[in-house]
Structure formats: structure tokens, C-alpha cells
């Protein structure tokens, strides 16, 4: 073979495999990485970009080396992150972009038998650590915007969640709501309407739009609230 291609591997390539790809007259191993390196090296760049509230991300085609996403970059392209973006939707957009970019890189190699690249910048290095299930539990004491970012980042895995009456409820969609002017407990239900369930947070409030109870289907938040008998003033854990 002429070149080895890896997509979203998230780990350090075994030395034995790396050495095979680096033999003479081969282009080495190329990685399609879902971030604008050196930001978000590591296993979960899409999740962490949304969780951090980044406005833009992208794809980098990089020449792999023995480090974790430390190799020189052959090409990169940006992609905006919308206010409603989830990891699921952004993953699909980046996958399409990455597919187009790797074809361009391989065509370039086929024509010229080389792939010019540039070393990554020293400044701006961040690491996208692996997502853990325990991160998904919502902390209502955080500000509404931060909670919304986490909900979108953890959709589809592991799914942001809270507890109510012993049941673990997953939150799939939400939006930042109005600023709470009077004093309320973090996690207190402020309103239930066809728009969703509005919950007080450490700063502002958040509107829960789509929820799922254990063993159930994803349904609108107001439907679940009615089915489970939630009331304004109840506090979510």
C-alpha cells in the first residue's frame, strides 16, 4: 500500500503499525481528526468543543507520529458550531467534511507523491479527555448556558441526566431561558408549558424540551412532566 488512513482513532498508534506505514516509498499514516489542532487533541474533540462553548471547530488532516495527535498538519478546514449543535449533528457534518478532505489529500499524493505539512503551533494546545458516564449528571448550580452546552455535548452519549423521585431522566434537547430575577433553588421547576419545563439554575434558567425516562421513548418535556406528576416548585436532583 502507499498510505494508511485512520479516522477518529483517539489513541496512540501502536509502534509496530506505525513502522509499517513509514517504510520507504510510502506516505505514512494520515489521521482525520475532528478539531482544529492543536486545540482538542485526544479522544473526544467534538464533545469537548461543544461543552466548552466553542464557536468554531473543524477537521485537520495530519501526519501521524508516535504522540497523541501531535504530528504535522497537512490541511485543515473550519466549521461553525451553531447554538443548537449537538455532538450527534456536529459529528455528521465533520464526517462529511473529513471525507472530502482526505480524498483531496490522497489525490494530491497521487499526483505529486508527497504531502507538504506544517508543525502544529506550540500555543493553544488543549486535550479532549475521554467522556465518562458520571460527567452526564446535571449540576443545576451551574449557569444555564453551561448546562445547555453540556446537554448538547453529551447527546447522544452518555446523555445528560438528572434524578426525580428515584428515576434517572435523560435530557436530549434544551435551550437557555430567561434570567431568574427572584430567588429560587437551583433545580427548582419554575414553569411547565407546551414549550417545555423551565428550571432554575445557578445563574438564569433553562428550558428542558425533550426528555426520556428509564425504559421509555424520547418525548416532549411537558408530556413527561404531566405523566410523572411534576409540579411547579418541585426540585430536580
Where are these regions (language model features)?
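Glycine/proline-rich, flexible active-site/cofactor-binding loop segments
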Residues: 1-3, 7-9, 205, 225
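Donor/substrate-binding cores of folate-linked one-carbon enzymes
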Residues: 3-127
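Short secondary-structure boundary/capping segments
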Residues: 17, 21, 65, 128-130, ...
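A generic structural signal for well-ordered coil/turn residues at beta-strand boundaries
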Residues: 55-58, 69-70, 75, 132-134, ...
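Short, solvent-exposed polar/charged micro-motifs at secondary-structure junctions
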Residues: 71, 126-130, 172, 181-182
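Acyl-group handling in specialized metabolite and lipid biosynthesis
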Residues: 129-142
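An anion-binding loop in the catalytic cleft
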Residues: 140-237
Amino acid at each position: 500500500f502507499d498510505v494508511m488512513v485512520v479516522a477518529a482513532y483517539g489513541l496512540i498508534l501502536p509502534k509496530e503499525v506505525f513502522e509499517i506505514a513509514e517504510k520507504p516509498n510510502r506516505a505514512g499514516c494520515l489521521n482525520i481528526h475532528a478539531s482544529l489542532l492543536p486545540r482538542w487533541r485526544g479522544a473526544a474533540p467534538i464533545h469537548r468543543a461543544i461543552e466548552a462553548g466553542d464557536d468554531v471547530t473543524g477537521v485537520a488532516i495530519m501526519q501521524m507520529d508516535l504522540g497523541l495527535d501531535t504530528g504535522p498538519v497537512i490541511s485543515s478546514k473550519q466549521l461553525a458550531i451553531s447554538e443548537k449543535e449537538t455532538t450527534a449533528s456536529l459529528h455528521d457534518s465533520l464526517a462529511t467534511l473529513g471525507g472530502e478532505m482526505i480524498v483531496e489529500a490522497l489525490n494530491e499524493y497521487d499526483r505529486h507523491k508527497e504531502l507538504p505539512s506544517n508543525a502544529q503551533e506550540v500555543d493553544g494546545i488543549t486535550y479532549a479527555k475521554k467522556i465518562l458516564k458520571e460527567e452526564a449528571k446535571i449540576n443545576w448550580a451551574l449557569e444555564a448556558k453551561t448546562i445547555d452546552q453540556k446537554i448538547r455535548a453529551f447527546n447522544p452519549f452518555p446523555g445528560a441526566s438528572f434524578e426525580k423521585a428515584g428515576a434517572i431522566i435523560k435530557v436530549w434537547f434544551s435551550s437557555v431561558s430567561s434570567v431568574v430575577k427572584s430567588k429560587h433553588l437551583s433545580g427548582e421547576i419554575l414553569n411547565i408549558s407546551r414549550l417545555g419545563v423551565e428550571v432554575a439554575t445557578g445563574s438564569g434558567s433553562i428550558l428542558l424540551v425533550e426528555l426520556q425516562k428509564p425504559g421509555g421513548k424520547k418525548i416532549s418535556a411537558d408530556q413527561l412532566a404531566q405523566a410523572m406528576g411534576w409540579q411547579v416548585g418541585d426540585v430536580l436532583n
